[in-house]
């Protein structure tokens, strides 16, 4: 029975990502819209390399560039599975951009806790616990997880990214419309930003 449920969820997810949806995509942004440098990160919340990038690069970049108005940062949802999709839905349950980024931080920091196993119900309990710890209500999170619009917005981001940028892996990092691949530590990333300032 568990195998049938797993197959059902996987098939449903794959079907959904092939649909073109009408809902407007909401990209999470941080920083000045007038910044000279725009950093777009296409990532999946279940991707270990995405978590490493976020944990080792994002906070330093925020302090050194985003908070100073030099860089505009965009988090583009590119979920690779149903668990990542649901985690993105919970992130978008928050009312403010600041709270959304707090949730994003915690999803990456606690990835090894919640993004394990194949039981989507257990995964949902774990991601809702993260939301509860950051003061999201259980009812609000349940409503968000049931919302087709929330899922459609996220899946639309993935579809648009695939069409425009031909994303092959996560994280994909684009700085001022130039793609950077491979392992990116902060020192390497800092040089990329400085070159674009």
Identify the residue ranges that each predicted region occupies.
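Extracytoplasmic thiol/disulfide redox context detector
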Residues: 1-81, 132, 150-164, 194-197
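Cysteine-centric redox/oxidoreductase cores and disulfide-bonded domains
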Residues: 79-169, 174-197
